[in-house]
């Protein structure tokens, strides 16, 4: 497993922390690295509150203090879902990523509800599809709502002979 996949796997693990609290939003986790060392972590804790990317950036400031802005300019961000580009209950994460000059963003899944991160912020290097299948599985309810306009439905049947 490559270091990129390890960082994305950690982001997916962080995302799972929002299982019971992030709805109706998807479960999202984020890891920020500098020289391949993790300097910030975050996840989307509750609807209407900071998204995973913002929590991870705040964690960088908590960990590095006055060295944070310089470190962020040389950093890579790993997030399981494409950063948001629209203003809802919170400002767009894409704007903060751009503002701090993060050099590269890796995300697992595209968010069809957004306007396209790479189109909105062309100066940032982007790589998508990292552990895409794992991310789709984690947020299958969200993707069903966005792509099919209906909830994800599973059915269990038990029978006795």
Regions found by a protein language model. Give the residues of each.
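Zinc-dependent deaminase
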Residues: 1-21, 35-38, 64-69, 73, ...
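A structural motif shared across PLP-dependent enzymes of the aminotransferase-like
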Residues: 20-23, 27, 48-51
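Short beta-strand scaffold segments in enzyme catalytic cores
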Residues: 27-36
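Residue-level recognition of the N-termini of beta-strands and the immediately preceding loop/turn
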Residues: 28, 73-76
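A short, conserved beta-strand element enriched in hydrophobic/aromatic residues
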Residues: 38-46
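Local cysteine-cluster metal-coordination motifs and their immediate loop/turn environment
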Residues: 43, 50, 54, 77-98, ...
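Generic beta-structure capping elements
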Residues: 59, 80, 158-160
């Amino acid at each position: 497993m490559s270091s990129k996949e390890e960082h994305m796997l950690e982001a997916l693990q962080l995302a799972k922390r929002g299982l019971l609290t992030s709805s109706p939003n998807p479960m999202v986790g984020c890891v920020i690295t500098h020289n391949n060392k993790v300097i910030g972590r975050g996840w989307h804790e509750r609807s209407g509150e900071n998204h995973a990317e913002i929590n991870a950036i705040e964690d960088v400031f908590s960990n590095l203090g006055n060295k944070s802005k310089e470190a962020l300019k040389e950093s890579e961000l790993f997030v399981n879902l494409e950063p948001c580009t629209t203003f809802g209950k919170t400002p767009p994460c894409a704007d903060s990523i751009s503002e701090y000059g993060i050099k590269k963003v890796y995300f697992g899944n595209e968010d069809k509800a957004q306007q396209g991160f790479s189109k909105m912020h062309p100066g940032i290097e982007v790589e998508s599809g990292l552990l895409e299948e794992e991310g789709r599985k984690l947020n299958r309810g969200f993707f069903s709502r966005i792509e099919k306009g209906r909830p994800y439905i599973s059915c269990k049947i038990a029978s006795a002979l």
